[in-house]
């Protein structure tokens, strides 16, 4: 491995080259964020799940393809809207999130990944994860991991596509979406 200074200089040079590249944006992707106007309208976050269920219905009526929700639903809704929310999640392709943690946990979201050879030696490894409620995970078409791999200077330039969590291999959110 290179000395820290050499590594940082190489990474910053890479950043400079990428920063000067012309960027194009797809018209096929829409990102919906939770902004100040939405918080004024619906109240503080997290919103009750029936509000989120209504938003999924609105997106479906707008004929969206895939809905990706990078929101961790690891606890029951305090307003009791999980059943309606689960019903709306099953309207079409909805992808949920799971996150990694430093302590070993049971893997609440069993998902399949095809393996050829032994990929485990090459994957980022985490002892456990915090997944969505099992009943909500069952209503979605997929669950992807959101995690990054920052470089020595603290900047994230790459995201692991697969991760080993406990004894299982999980895809990241982007791969699960595809």
Please name every model-derived segment.
Residues 1-178:
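Non-transmembrane functional regions of envelope-associated proteins
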């Amino acid at each position: 491995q290179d000395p820290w200074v050499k590594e940082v200089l190489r990474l910053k040079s890479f950043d400079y080259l990428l920063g000067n590249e012309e960027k194009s944006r797809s018209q096929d992707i829409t990102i919906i964020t939770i902004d100040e106007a939405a918080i004024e309208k619906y109240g503080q976050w997290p919103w009750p799940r029936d509000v989120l269920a209504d938003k999924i219905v609105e997106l479906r009526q707008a004929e969206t393809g895939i809905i990706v929700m990078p929101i961790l639903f690891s606890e029951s809704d305090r307003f009791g809207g999980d059943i309606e929310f689960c019903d709306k999640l099953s309207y079409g392709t909805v992808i949920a999130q799971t996150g990694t943690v430093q302590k070993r946990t049971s893997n609440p979201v069993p998902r399949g990944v095809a393996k050829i050879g032994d990929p485990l030696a090459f994957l980022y490894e985490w002892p456990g994860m915090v997944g969505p409620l099992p009943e909500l995970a069952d209503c979605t078409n997929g669950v992807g991991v959101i995690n990054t791999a920052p470089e020595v200077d603290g900047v994230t330039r790459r995201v692991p596509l697969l991760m080993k969590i406990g004894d299982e291999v999980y895809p990241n959110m982007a791969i699960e979406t595809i």
